[in-house]
Amino acid sequence: KNKPIFVSLTNSYHGETIGALSVGDVELYKDTYEPLLIQSIQTPVPKDMSLEAAKEAAQKFEELCKNRSDEISAIIVEPLIQAAGYMHMYHPHFLELLRDICDRYDVHLIADEVMAGFGRTGKLFACEHANITPDFLVLSKGITGGYLPLSVVLTSNDVYAKFYCDYLEYKAFLHSHSYTGNALACAAANATLDLFEKDDVITQNKAKAAYMMEKLKEFEKLDNVLEIRQTGMVSVVELKGYSSDERIGLKVHQYCLEREVLIRPLGHVVYFMPPYVITYEEIDKMMDTTLEAIKQL
């Protein structure tokens, strides 16, 4: 079938090459390249982490599929957390509903777990929180622990079989990349995965995430905090009462940097996404210093 259209969520970000920019929805990154981008459609992301918001957003996507599923090839989502989209989070049930809708309307589900994959959300993959399997799973970052660049796309045997053929049939993908299957990067990935198993990283992460959640409650008491939220080892403090011109996130960043704590706010959103090797003492310093910074505003 000729189904050229990709759907993504509002507020989404998937990278900065042409195809990835085309399905993103963060103006800061894509506006300059708008004339070059591939056609895509955005459907609403759940407005918050509630079950009701998940159902409302899924209904919007189903309405889109009812009208245009003959044109839609796939929907791409960042499971549970929209990282560059101000660390917006939503309920896992949204992924369950998407999986069901995609199955019924013959639309592929692509899960971009470049950020969330390999333990960041409390399970090895974020999709596991919804007990779903996407048609395509995009992975990077955590697969090598950040030591070497490597990305991977996993797909199903069904998709693989569609392109499996004798050479002269020309159904297979005939393109490749210069560094595909880089042996050193793959060795780093294997070593990282060995450590995940040996050190039981997922269990350790769950304990550290629970500790971070307790620390996060101190921020909720502040008058200039709009909301706190957390998924796994991603904790977020969203500030209120400041204009964009005040560059409030930069002020928090500078205060912390002077005290040997490196954080990277997104506008008025301050978040913690530490490496898994962080100690409890380092969590204390990271979050206590940031708390002091916000109190100083």
Where in this protein do the model-derived segments appear?
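Conserved N-terminal phosphate-binding loop of PLP-dependent enzymes in the Aspartate aminotransferase
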Residues: K1-L297
